[in-house]
Amino acid sequence: MAAELSMGQELPTSPLAMEYVNDFDLLKFDVKKEPLGRAERPGRPCTRLQPAGSVSSTPLSTPCSSVPSSPSFSPTEPKTHLEDLYWMASNYQQMNPEALNLTPEDAVEALIGSHPVPQPLQSFDGFRSAHHHHHHHHPHPHHGYPGAGVTHDDLGQHAHPHHHHHHQASPPPSSAASPAQQLPTSHPGPGPHATAAATAAGGNGSVEDRFSDDQLVSMSVRELNRHLRGFTKDEVIRLKQKRRTLKNRGYAQSCRYKRVQQKHHLENEKTQLIQQVEQLKQEVSRLARERDAYKVKCEKLANSGFREAGSTSDSPSSPEFFL
């Protein structure tokens, strides 16, 4: 259809022909490259030539009697509106005149690019949804198109492939709409990372209560890091700070306990030493008394021995006296 619209300067004004033209979708057909020297098909009432590199978007769709004869091909022929038409079709895949609220004449003028579109184009999703709605409520009016000089065989040859492609291509809007309908139900459902984050957030109030103080103090850093997987950074920092505080507190308590134990030990040793000093003092006093007693006794013995020696020398009974 794009080739006939681009090469023909005049279009049929019949309402049935316009409705038949408008019902075609540009991208429902296979896109293929046609060679420069394409031979004409024998046995067809109408023949056409296309420029080299042109894109065939649709089979012959308009009646042969209502389309003027195609001009002869020349290499110096300026580019037609076919590229613009293909560009418009590729960007707005399903351009429907009813979706734009256009008349058939405006739709044809917009397709061939001779006049600007009266209304601003809507978004792609608007075209898609409107086209999907249109095909649900207006199913294939061109299949029963009876006339305008086209035989039933020619119409069947073009309508049936279009019918086949139309049924194959119509599910994508519904399939594309189904993920969009499933998005509100799929997004609230948490993914794996969101589940881990939700689990960590759910245990936010009991993160510090998950491990006892003894477990935090006795647990190694590697084991603690393995248990803290899945928690947020703030929770890990808070729990490690608590562990550090408990460790410092335990270290302080241990040092205080050691100091107290050492103090008790020193006090016990001091008491024992004091007792030993008292015992030694008592021993010294006892020895001093014994010394004094021995001294007095020694003095007494010395005095008594001197007297005995003096009395024996003065006695006349001694042998020296007689000599």
Curated annotation (Swiss-Prot):
Record's subcellular location: Nucleus
Gene Ontology process terms (BP): abducens nerve formation; brain segmentation; cornified envelope assembly; gene expression; in utero embryonic development; inner ear morphogenesis; keratinocyte differentiation; negative regulation of erythrocyte differentiation
Region (Leucine-zipper): 266-287
Region (Disordered): 34-78, 116-210
Keywords: Activator, DNA-binding, Isopeptide bond, Nucleus, Proto-oncogene, Repressor, Transcription, Transcription regulation, Tumor suppressor, Ubl conjugation
Tissue spec: Expressed in pancreatic alpha-cells (glucagon-positive cells), in podocytes of the kidney and macrophages (at protein level). Most abundant in kidney, gut, lung and brain.
Effect of substituting residue 248 to A: Reduces ability to activate insulin and glucagon gene expression
Composition skew (Basic and acidic residues), residue ranges: 34-43
Residue stretches of biased makeup (Basic residues): 129-143, 159-168
Disulfide bonds: none
Glycyl lysine isopeptide (Lys-Gly) (interchain with G-Cter in SUMO) cross-link, chain position(s): 32, 297
Composition bias, Low complexity: 54-77, 192-201
One Pfam family here: Maf_N
Stretches the record annotates as Basic motif: 238-263
Phenotype seen when the gene is deleted: Mice show a defect in frequency of respiratory rhythm with a fatal apnea at birth due to lack of neurons from the preBoetC region. They displayed renal dysgenesis with abnormal podocyte differentiation as well as tubular apoptosis. They show altered actin-dependent macrophage morphology. They show a reduced number of cells expressing insulin and glucagon. Embryos also lack the abducens nerve which normaly innervates the lateral rectus muscle that is involved in eye movement.
One example GO MF annotation: identical protein binding
Domain bZIP: 238-301
GO CC, any one term: RNA polymerase II transcription regulator complex
Role according to the record: Acts as a transcriptional activator or repressor. Plays a pivotal role in regulating lineage-specific hematopoiesis by repressing ETS1-mediated transcription of erythroid-specific genes in myeloid cells. Required for monocytic, macrophage, osteoclast, podocyte and islet beta cell differentiation. Involved in renal tubule survival and F4/80 maturation. Activates the insulin and glucagon promoters. Together with PAX6, transactivates weakly the glucagon gene promoter through the G1 element. SUMO modification controls its transcriptional activity and ability to specify macrophage fate.
Subunit structure: Homodimer or heterodimer with other bHLH-Zip transcription factors. Forms homodimers and heterodimers with FOS, FOSB and FOSL2, but not with JUN proteins (JUN, JUNB and JUND). Interacts with the intracellular cytoplasmic domain of LRP1 (LRPICD); the interaction results in a moderate reduction of MAFB transcriptional potential. Binds DNA as a homodimer or a heterodimer. Interacts with PAX6; the interaction is direct. Interacts with ETS1 and LRP1.
Domain writeup: The leucine-zipper domain is involved in the interaction with LRPICD.
Listed name of the protein: Transcription factor MafB
Organism: Mus musculus (Mouse)
Gene: Mafb
